[in-house]
Amino acid sequence: AKEHPYLIGDFIWTLQDHLGECNTCNERYGKLPEDDRPKNLRGKDYPWLLNHGGVVDLLGKPLPAIHRYELAWGGHGLWLAAQVPVHDGVVPTYSSYLWTDTIESWSFDGCEGKPTWIDVYTDAAEAEVFVNGSSLGRTPVVDFFAKFPAAYEAGEVLAVGYDADGHELYRNTLATARSETILTAVPNKKKLIADGEDFSFIDIAVTDRQGIVKTWPERVISIQVDGAGTLAGFGSANPVNAERFDQNHHTTYQGRLQAVIRSARTAGNVRVMLSAEGLEPVTITIPVKEAAHE
């Protein structure tokens, strides 16, 4: 895109994660399993479920890698992301499609002192990262990307982008969630049509009171649906997952889940009740209205 101004677009494979074609990017931490199969068939065994090659996850949430595409096509700014510190600081390898496993979070309860990585996406010439005020160094940005080794320490991560003359251009932060933990549920539709074919996608997350998602550790969330609607699906964006999507409980992935509610063919209200051990239950009500007839 930088070298050829006549380019007007880019084909991304894939934009969004999908079921099947398991582990197309061949993500692995360490060596491939040793067996008689071709290399491209190893490391994809059950319970691998998703292709895990998109820049939007299965629930429709953009992943940090999407910022690199934005910058390549003329965008400006700075974003940062961190690896969940449960891999002993190992950087995964990929055959294609992906290049990092970091997420836009700095909330990893129980991981104090464990090694991690912090990624910076920016069109600045150089980037510097601070963890609770301590600099991790300053490095040139190559192809809109810079990577910093770190040890997890609850608090705040600050990334600063500089131009070629050393002047500050951007800054951005990630903060650790506070101690109080709640369930949140946000439907993309706040009313449905009573035709049996209308859906509301409810984004569910474990957060603090300020809305910062608690991405680790994971929790099992239970769901109950009654009234003028049914549960069409309930699951996470976890690419390695043996849990079903048609059950009334599921484990979060990076603190998130999604429930899909189908309207009934009769008007009324559909009630969605969510619960998890140690957390206050949450109930949301979605009106289901008769379709307007012209």
Segments from the language model and where they lie:
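Short, hydrophobic beta-strand segments
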Residues: 147-152, 246-265
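Short beta-strand elements
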Residues: 170-179, 279-294
